[in-house]
Each structure stands twice: as structure tokens, then as C-alpha cells.
Amino acid sequence: MRAHRIDTFLIRENIKLEIIHESNSYFGGEHISIAFRFKHLGSQHELFNYKEKLLTVDKAVEEKLEQQAKVQDDGEGTMENQTWSLKSLLGAFKRTGEPEESVDVDNMKMLNESKMLREKIQKQMYFHQPVTLISGYVQISGVFQYDSEVISESKFKQDEVKMVGLDIVPGHTTNSVLALEDGEHFKGKRNLTNYLNSDYTNVTNGLLFSESGSRGRTGTYNERTLMISNDTSIKTLPLLLIPQTLLFSEISLEPGEVRTFYFKSTKLPKDICPSYSSSKVASINYTLEVGADVLSDDNIEKFSNRVPITIAPYISSNAEQYTSRLDKPAIILKTGNIKELKPRLFTRKVSTASAVSFGRRKSSIIDIDSPLEDNEFVKRVKKNFIELVESNQNVSRDIDELIDLQMGVQFGKDEDSSDPEPNDSHFSNEMVTSAESSLRSDAVTKRRKSYSVRDNISNLEQKMWNDCSLVKSDENSNLLPQLINLQNAYQINRNNETMAKVSLSAPFYKTTDDINLVIELDPITTPLLKVTSLTVSLESFEIINPKYKTEGKGIGSKPKGNSVYEKHFICFDECKSVSVKLLPPRSPTNQITGQFKTDVFQHKWMIGLKFVIIAKTESITLDQFYEDKKGILFHSKENLEGEEFTCYVPIPILCTSEDFMGW
């Protein structure tokens, strides 16, 4: 398991490109930092061996030709010394006529074999030859796509805009293969595909993809196939553009050589709209494009590919988020900063366990200048330890968190800067190295580096335990609080009768959390009814602003949810409670989006509960098949039909402070 998400592509058969994402997701108000590693897959040793083989073949041919020429010269000299008579002339023809033809055939055969062997060696050596790359670049763009049959195009202040660099729908394409789980391949020119190391992927690009149909699976998210490209109802508005940034003008890769370039953008706007692709109506997609030209036999082969990047919303320390604006001109940032990372000559091997648990800290002994300061320091450390123990008696906290707090007092904060510049080679090299050497077992890992947004999210849970009020900090700001009037218990009524009680494990969740809940059925208040089955689903809803709705398209109607995860239960006999665990997807390129709000629509999460209710009788699941004086024979019912009752429970889900790694 790697510590970072890594996307891998082959520029050509012997050049591999690795895109190492500094974080996944990127937050509003922070930088986008990515390392690009160009690696020659050949070997200097193999190249030397093939050159030696070529020299051996050429030398063998030359020796054979020289030997044959010498034999011919000796034969001609012998004939000149003989007496010119009719008998000797006939003898000469008998001696030299047939052998010369045989020698020519042998020579041609030998030359052809040598030529074929030489071509074979050259083909094998081609893989290990140096390669020249020119004009390497990187570009980041973002678009908002929507279905104009639901969201009115005329309601936007700006019409659909075409911007150079944002040619996602009709423009730049790459050769790719998109495969489904059933093995069907779609080949040809495709937009925004070739996302991963493999052709097999369920990554989407919003409305460029449509649902491939219900497959009866649970836990799937955004499994879609490419739509017909001439769908005129899909409209696109540009949101973000970081123009092409030159990685290098020209580099030459020797066999086995690795060149790494570190890209860092300017800070993203805090009110940037997050990535969103779980809807059939609207999607927000951010993509990273990287390209280069390859010099090959006096020809230039172009390479370019795109990968999705995930952007999460900015969250303040009071769990506030900005209301993002989609109906505005696109944000154009400055080009990013580029620095080539040189490999270290001598590196110290760091224990995996220590690297995972803690960052590097300052020594507490070095900072002590006097015995008095030593005594004060020890008292402060002891006092902090006692306070942590006392605070843990009321509310149980994670042991790792307690250790971090104690070590923060004893050894100081991490030496790493929370906002490294592009010329910070220590951080950049550490990022690239840890991406290769990390052996962590989870698909999600806590970041060692400290960022303000991540700190804000990490501290929210502790604030909730301490009953801190998370109210709006500034009434005049565009920040909206996300955690208000929280509760983790709900009572479900039907016709003024209590059906069930729902208890959630937490008042709010993050996108990496398991959602645990218990549903307690109430047979006392509904003695004549029985719940025979229960379906629990995690669904995303988007509530479209009426101002932007197409006239006559579901104005006033209830929004429909998009199911992300679903569990089905059958309730036998006297079933009083059902325990449910909902598992949202958590892969590096397949993750859910936390709640957010824009000027066009608002995204929320709900837990859907569908009960199947039947009248309670003596034999609910049995039918009388036969009866005589000896008794009655029952058979179980093949079908059990009942009345459906559906309701929804709101659930706050925010983005996580943890990273989605790669493998």
C-alpha cells in the first residue's frame, strides 16, 4: 500500500509516467501539489550486453568474409602456376565450377542469418535506448455540467462559454479503452478516460457518463459508461483553469534513469465548488492533464492524458462552508511553480512504524539551557499528562490522539512546515519516497502534515464531545454553518402510530466513516401490524434552486435520491431490532462528496428506510395445505406481499481530514 495516490501511464513502451498526488482530496484555500516522475524502464547493463552481441555478430561476419576471400585468392594463385593445357583446363573447370556456386550459396545463407540476428538484437536493444522528451506540460481545469432539460440554460447570466484549455466535451481526446465488469470493451477516441493504471475502472466524468443499468449490486457508486457524445442536452460551463505550466523544455532519459518534477499551484479559492459526480442532472469535475512530445526516429510522437482530481470544500473551525457560485465567470489562476527534484545521494532508512505514527520532532533536551528551565519543563510535561488523564475519565478518547497531545508538549510540534514552498526539496523528496516505500494496510491514512482545513475537521469531533456551540461566527459572511440542531435519534411514525426508532452512532459523519445505526421496531403501538422486510440505503439528494429550474420540469415535486449503498433485511418471527452498517465507497478515485451548497443547487445526504408491512395473523408466513382428524399440514408461502412505507432520515456528512491512498 502506498502513502499517496499514484496514477501510472506508459508514454511509450519503455517510458513510464507516475503522477504522485500530494493529497487526495485537495481543499479549497490550499495548494495543489503533485510530483511527476518520468522513468526509463530500460537497463544500462542490458544495453551494454546487446551492443556487445552486435559487435560479436559483425566480427563473425567479417572473419567469415575474410576467410572466404583468402581461400579464393589461394585458388586463383594455384591455377596461375599450372601448365595451360587442355587437360589442365578441363581439370580446373571440374575443380572450381561447382564449388564456387556452393560457396556463394553458403555465403548468402550466412549473411541472411547474420542479418536476421542483427535485426533481432536491434529490436531488443531499442527498448534500452536513450529517449528524448520535449515540451512536458501540466494543466488543471474544472467544469460544471448540467442537463438543460432540468436546469434552464437561459436562467444563467452567462451562456455556455468556450474557453481555450477547457475543451473537455468536444475537444481534446485520447486513445483509450473503457471496460465494464462484464468484459465489454469500447475502443476509440474518448474524452477524459484512461484514468487509472488499468483499463478496468468505475471512475466517471460526471454527465459524460450515464448509468449502465441496475446490476443488482450494493456498494457501487458512479458506475457508468460513456454517453453518446452528440447529446445536445448536456451543457458545460467552465469553472477553473490553471493554464499550461511547462514541466521541462527538453530532457534525455538514459536507461534506468528517473527524472522527477514537482508542481505546486497557487492557493485555490476558499469558495471553490467541490467535486461532485453522483447525480444524473449536474456534475462538477476537475481534471489534471499532463503531456509531452517524444522524439522517435526524427518523428515527434505526442502524448497526453487526463486524470480526475478531487477537490473538497473549505471548512472553518466552526464547521462552516462557503456557498459556491457556479453562475459566474471562470476562475483563472496563475501558472504553477515547477522544481526538479534531484535524487539524494545518501538516504537514511526510516522505520515504517515510526514514520507512520509521528513526524520528526525537536529534541526536548537541546532546548533546555539551565537546570531551572529543566525543572519548569518537567513540571509542565507532568501537568499536561495529568490533565489528559483526567479529561479522559469523562469522555474516552483515542489513545493515539492522547499520545500526540503529550508528545506535542514534550517534544514540540513537527518540524515540517504546514505550507511548504515548491523549493522545499525535503518535503517534496519525502513525498515521492514515501509513495514508493510505504507499507500501510489501510486504504485511508491520516496525513502527517498539518493543514488548517484538516485541523479544523479533525477538531470538530472533539468540539462536539465538549458540547461546544458551533454557531455562525460572522453574520455578514458567506459562510454557512453545517452542524446545527444535530441529533442522533429519530422516531418514525405512521398514521400517528410509532413504527420504529432509529439510533445513529454519531451526530454527524465524515466521508471515510462507517455509518452505524440501530432500528428498533415497536410491536406494542402497532400490535396488528408486522414488519416483514426492511431496506436501508444511503442516498444523495440535490435540491435545485427554483430560479434555475426549467419551466414545467418538476417544480414543487419531491427530489429523487441517488442510492450509494443499500442493505436489505428480512424480519423473521419476533424481530425487535435491526443493526445496520453502511459502507460508502472509499477508493482513491471513487469517494463520496460531503454536503455543500451552491447558487444553483444544494447537495444533502439522507438515509432511506423502506418498510414492508403486513397484517399480523396467527400464521403470517404459512399457508394451510392439508387438514384431517390427525392434524394440519402447513407450507411456507412462496410470496409475501405487503404495504410499503418509505421515509428518510437526514444525516450530516462532511468531507474527511484523512487521505485516500493508492496501491
UniProtKB/Swiss-Prot annotation:
Present with 589 molecules/cell in log phase SD medium. Residues 426-440 have a biased composition (Polar residues). Disulfide bonds: none annotated. GO terms for cellular component: cytosol; Golgi apparatus; Golgi membrane; guanyl-nucleotide exchange factor complex; Ric1-Rgp1 guanyl-nucleotide exchange factor complex. Keywords: Cell cycle, Cell division, Golgi apparatus, Guanine-nucleotide releasing factor, Mitosis, Phosphoprotein. It holds the Pfam family Rgp1. GO terms for biological process: cell division; retrograde transport, endosome to Golgi. Its main location: Golgi. It comes from Saccharomyces cerevisiae (strain ATCC 204508 / S288c) (Baker's yeast). Residues 412-443 are annotated as: Disordered. Forms a complex with RIC1. The modification Phosphoserine is found at residues 351, 354, 357, 363-364, 370. It comes from the Eukaryota. It is found in: Golgi apparatus. Signal peptide: none annotated. One of its GO terms (molecular function) is guanyl-nucleotide exchange factor activity. This is Guanine nucleotide exchange factor subunit RGP1. The RIC1-RGP1 complex acts as a guanine nucleotide exchange factor (GEF), which activates YPT6 by exchanging bound GDP for free GTP. It is thereby required for efficient fusion of endosome-derived vesicles with the Golgi. The RIC1-RGP1 participates in the recycling of SNC1, presumably by mediating fusion of endosomal vesicles with the Golgi compartment. Required for proper mitotic growth. InterPro entries: Rgp1. Belongs to the RGP1 family.
